[in-house]
């Protein structure tokens, strides 16, 4: 998702500050045309506060949007660190808006990803906004006949959601394979 956001911003003439903090896969860093900087903020299973301070020091003076890819393996500890250390309020005081992008997937993971979104929305303070990406790759984003917009996870947090992005369900035989190939090769 980070690569898509950064590419979109670049296509609009913006120059976002791109940072990859994923401790397992530095996929975002592989997009050389996006000038992604790699930062190691994890120390084992925990956030290294000194390294995290370096991240904030990069964000603070930025006049452009900042796109950070943190990866699934560090998402829970990073979210916990952000909330317990009141980082969203700090960023807000610096004139920045924290926008958390989260993915809801269809199929078997639907209930888990809905629950994850609801937990994020309840844990993050009011300063944080959310962009929800609906990914139908594994199945439709529906539960018991209700669409995402009808589900409690959304209706209870609707005011916090800045946007909902529907990822198109591309046929693998055509555009789906092309997009997959582009992403694998980290092309922009």
Task: Mark where each language-model region is.
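P-loop NTPase switch/communication element
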Residues: 24-41
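Glycine-rich, highly charged phosphate/nucleotide-binding loops
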Residues: 47-56, 82
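Glycine-rich phosphate-binding P-loop
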Residues: 1-5
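Hydrophobic anchor at the start of a short beta-strand
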Residues: 15-16, 36, 66, 98, ...
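Short beta-strand-centered segment that lines the nucleotide-binding/catalytic pocket of NTP-utilizing
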Residues: 12-26
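Conserved catalytic-core segment of NTP-binding enzymes
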Residues: 74-169, 173-177
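NTP-binding/hydrolysis catalytic cores, primarily Walker-type P-loop NTPases
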Residues: 180-188
């Amino acid at each position: 998702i980070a690569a898509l956001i950064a590419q979109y911003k670049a296509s609009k003439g913006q120059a976002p500050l791109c940072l990859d903090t994923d401790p397992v896969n530095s996929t975002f860093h592989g997009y050389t045309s996006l000038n992604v900087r790699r930062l190691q903020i994890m120390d084992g299973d925990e956030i290294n506060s000194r390294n995290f301070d370096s991240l904030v020091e990069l964000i603070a003076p930025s006049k452009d949007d900042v796109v950070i890819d943190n990866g699934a393996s560090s998402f829970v500890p990073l979210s916990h660190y952000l909330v317990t250390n009141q980082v969203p309020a700090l960023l807000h005081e610096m004139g920045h808006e924290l926008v958390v992008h989260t993915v809801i997937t269809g199929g078997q993971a639907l209930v888990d990803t809905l629950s994850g979104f609801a937990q994020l929305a309840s844990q993050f303070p009011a300063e944080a906004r959310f962009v929800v990406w609906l990914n139908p790759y594994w199945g439709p984003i529906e539960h018991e006949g209700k669409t995402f917009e009808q589900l409690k996870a959304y209706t209870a947090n609707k005011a916090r959601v800045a946007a909902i992005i529907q990822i198109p369900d591309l046929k693998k035989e055509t555009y789906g394979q092309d997009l997959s190939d582009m992403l694998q090769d980290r092309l922009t």
